[in-house]
Amino acid sequence: MLTTKQKELLLFINDRIKDTGVSPSFDEMKEALDLASKSGIHRLITALEERGFIRRLANRARALEVLKLPDSAIPPPNARQRRDFRPALVTNQGAEAPRIAGMIPLVGRIAAGSPISAIQQENGQVASPGGLPEGDDYFALEVQGDSMIQAGILNGDTVILKRTNTAQTGDIVVALIDGEEATLKRLRRKGASVALEAANPAFETRIFGPDRVEVQGRLVALIRRYE
């Protein structure tokens, strides 16, 4: 299953090859996805290659071949002209399922450990735990990892988050790092820097410049199932 970034890049490459017969340059791909550096494109291409969606052709410049597209792939309108794209951890790129009152969309998995590429596909809905203010926009993610165990968040839990791009120091948030990797951590502001702090001494606090971290949601509730 592809992340939104991977799918966006795959469709961009596929469209460009169809139009021109040549795959786009790394600079063109970086611009199309609005990434800060080409290293992010390298990682996305490697991930697509490992998953069997593309391959690199030897001894040819700008040589990428699209081997397949996801079954659900529907190229977004004006994909080649999009310059306002911003990473969105929880934006569903396909048709949305009908919303049911009292239900919250489950949009994928989130790392409570080392950052991982978040899955950008709606996986159903979960019942609202109740007590949440009406009128706010919520989403749910399944937790992978144990970096937040001392905050009471365990591997396999489902976290409910309020969709927001702002947070106070000390809030537990979904953070997007460099527009690619997502993690669930406690946010601390240290001067001009942003620290993503685990609640497990086995994990180090990671510190970034403010332009490298984008808050996607703030933790408001947790659901745990006992088998």
From Swiss-Prot:
Site-annotated residues for Cleavage: A112, G113
Top-level taxon: Bacteria
GO MF, one annotated term: DNA binding
Biological processes annotated in GO: DNA repair; DNA replication; negative regulation of DNA-templated transcription; proteolysis; SOS response
DNA-binding region(s) in UniProt: 26-46
Enzyme Commission code: 3.4.21.88
HAMAP family, per the entry: LexA
Reported function: Represses a number of genes involved in the response to DNA damage (SOS response), including recA and lexA. In the presence of single-stranded DNA, RecA interacts with LexA causing an autocatalytic cleavage which disrupts the DNA-binding part of LexA, leading to derepression of the SOS regulon and eventually DNA repair.
Protein name (record): LexA repressor
Taxonomic lineage of the native organism: Bacteria, Pseudomonadati, Pseudomonadota, Alphaproteobacteria, Hyphomonadales
